Amino acid sequence: MNFSIKSVIFLAIVALATLVSASTNPKVTNKVYFDIKQGDKDLGRIVLGLYGEVVPKTVENFRALATGEKGYGYKNSKFHRVIKDFMIQGGDFTRGDGTGGKSIYGERFADENFKLRHTGPGILSMANAGRDTNGSQFFITTVTTSWLDGRHVVFGKVIEGMDVVTAIETTKTLPGDRPATPVIIADCGELPVSNNNDAKAEL
């Protein structure tokens, strides 16, 4: 009996440790890139690692919009909202002002889960208009934004190109936090995942 109880306790500890590991150091299952332009200037490339084992539906939506395989997506869309010491927001490829966008599942889809947290700069998370209103809009943090935990679905992190994120974050803005010179995703798509180097996101 004692052996059986010890076995159950051991398995429970292993399961808990696995869950904690998945939520604090999730595996990068997919990578996408954004090539960014502002006016005539190439700002560079942002590479984003996606956590498909934790939030597979959210990741698939973002990945497919990055590749444009559904006939629509992020290419030539804007970062329409930029707030220094907070985040940069994009993904509204239908209206370009933060009121549009759509997912590959329809106009909106439900919050998948809130297992991952907004722990620092470079976190990739879904923008929304309230509970279960995810579409195509997303944001990348430039600081820790723990007050967004449990409200926005985290699904990835910047692997390369935080300097580009910073350049966008610090650009001159107009009323409504809109960049004075439009910041455009000139090209985007998917990259192969290297198990050795891509597991660790850029801090």
Swiss-Prot record:
Keyword flag Metal-binding: no
Name the residues that bind cyclosporin A.
Answer: W147
PROSITE patterns linked: CSA_PPIASE_1, CSA_PPIASE_2
One matching Pfam family is Pro_isomerase
Q: How is its activity regulated?
A: Inhibited by cyclosporin A (CsA).
Q: Where in the cell is it found?
A: Endoplasmic reticulum lumen
Instruction: Report the record's Gene Ontology biological process terms.
Output: protein folding
Query: In what residue span(s) does the PPIase cyclophilin-type domain sit?
Result: 33-190
Q: List the GO terms this entry assigns under cellular component, sorted alphabetically.
A: endoplasmic reticulum lumen; fungal-type vacuole
Assigned EC number:
5.2.1.8
Q: Where is this motif: Prevents secretion from ER?
A: 200-203
Catalysed reaction, written as an equation: [protein]-peptidylproline (omega=180) = [protein]-peptidylproline (omega=0)
Q: Which GO terms describe its molecular function?
A: cyclosporin A binding; peptidyl-prolyl cis-trans isomerase activity
Source domain of life: Eukaryota
InterPro entries from the UniProt entry: Cyclophilin-like_dom_sf, Cyclophilin-type_PPIase, Cyclophilin-type_PPIase_CS, Cyclophilin-type_PPIase_dom
Q: Which residues form the signal peptide?
A: 1-22
The UniProt keyword set, sorted, is: Endoplasmic reticulum, Isomerase, Rotamase, Signal
Question: Does the UniProt entry include the keyword Isomerase?
Answer: yes
Described function: PPIases accelerate the folding of proteins. It catalyzes the cis-trans isomerization of proline imidic peptide bonds in oligopeptides.
Family, according to the entry, reads as follows:
Belongs to the cyclophilin-type PPIase family. PPIase B subfamily.
The name this protein carries in UniProt is: Peptidyl-prolyl cis-trans isomerase B
Taxonomy of origin reads: Eukaryota, Fungi, Fungi incertae sedis, Chytridiomycota, Chytridiomycota incertae sedis
- Per the record, the gene is CYPB
